[in-house]
Amino acid sequence: MKVRASVRRRTADCQVVRRKGRIYIINKKNPRLKQRQG
């Protein structure tokens, strides 16, 4: 999980999810693209 100041979808498979006021990017096909906004 990368923690970044700004997150964006890297591929079409990425999903943008809001949990507890934070924005997450999750990708089932390529889990190394997981991100969380700072």
UniProtKB/Swiss-Prot annotation:
One Gene Ontology MF term: structural constituent of ribosome
GO cellular component terms, semicolon-separated: ribonucleoprotein complex; ribosome
Keywords for this protein: Ribonucleoprotein, Ribosomal protein
PANTHER family: 50S RIBOSOMAL PROTEIN L36 2, LARGE RIBOSOMAL SUBUNIT PROTEIN BL36B
Gene source species: Methylacidiphilum infernorum (isolate V4) (Methylokorus infernorum (strain V4))
Alphabetized InterPro entries for the sequence: Ribosomal_bL36 (IPR000473), Ribosomal_bL36_sp (IPR035977), Ribosomal_L36_bact (IPR047621)
Name this polypeptide is given: Large ribosomal subunit protein bL36
SUPFAM superfamilies referenced in this protein's UniProt entry, alphabetically: Ribosomal protein L36
Signal peptide positions (record): none
Recorded family membership: Belongs to the bacterial ribosomal protein bL36 family.
GO terms of biological process kind: translation
Pfam families tied to this protein: Ribosomal_L36
